[in-house]
Regions:
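Histidine-centered metal-chelating micro-motifs
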Residues: 35, 111-115
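Extracellular and organelle-lumenal recognition/adhesion modules and their flexible linkers in secreted
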Residues: 114, 119, 126
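Non-heme Fe(II)/2-oxoglutarate
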Residues: 1-15, 33-35
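A short hydrophobic beta-strand segment most commonly corresponding to one strand
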Residues: 47-49, 122-138
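Hydrophobic, well-ordered secondary-structure segments
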Residues: 1-6, 83, 91-94, 99-101, ...
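Catalytic core of non-heme Fe(II) oxygenases with the double-stranded beta-helix
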Residues: 21-107, 124
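Short, loop-centered acidic/histidine patches that primarily coordinate divalent metals
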Residues: 76-78, 109-111, 131-133
């Protein structure tokens, strides 16, 4: 809730009226060569991923000798068009990869298109995901 407060410049009084509401959660176990296609979470405000066991995620060199990221979560930019103006080069990236780390929680807007890139490993990659909304106290 601290992020919500700071990003929106809400005062303590307003924040005291907000209550996070966990709508659903599930475990996702990714085996060797598993992945999760790009998707969004509908009818919710926030999505989250908690990395329980990242298995063998990280940088790997594939059989062709190419360095790639293994088992990352990819978040796609909601900005469809951008300018090449030097002050806005950060907008030119169409996706950001988050490299999983055990015990880390990632929270993101549910409308953000995201995926789990292919995972290659002998041990499973285990995450707990959830959807939530923010309600106002009654």
């Amino acid at each position: 809730m601290t992020v919500v407060k700071n990003v929106n410049s809400y005062d303590d009084n307003y924040m005291s009226q907000l209550v996070p509401d966990l709508r659903e959660s599930w475990a996702h176990i990714t085996n060797n060569n598993g992945y999760h296609d790009a998707h969004k979470h509908l009818n919710t405000s926030w999505g989250g991923i908690y990395y329980v066991d990242t298995g063998e995620c990280g940088e790997v060199v594939d059989e062709d000798g190419i360095l790639r990221m293994n088992g990352t979560n990819r978040f796609y930019s909601p900005i469809q068009y951008f300018t090449l103006d030097a002050s806005m080069t950060y907008l030119s990236h169409d996706a950001v990869d988050i490299s999983p780390e055990n015990g880390v929680l990632v929270i993101f807007p549910a409308y953000l298109l995201h995926s789990a890139t292919p995972y290659i490993g002998k041990t499973d990659r285990v995450v707990i995901s959830f959807n939530s909304i923010t309600n106002q106290k009654t």
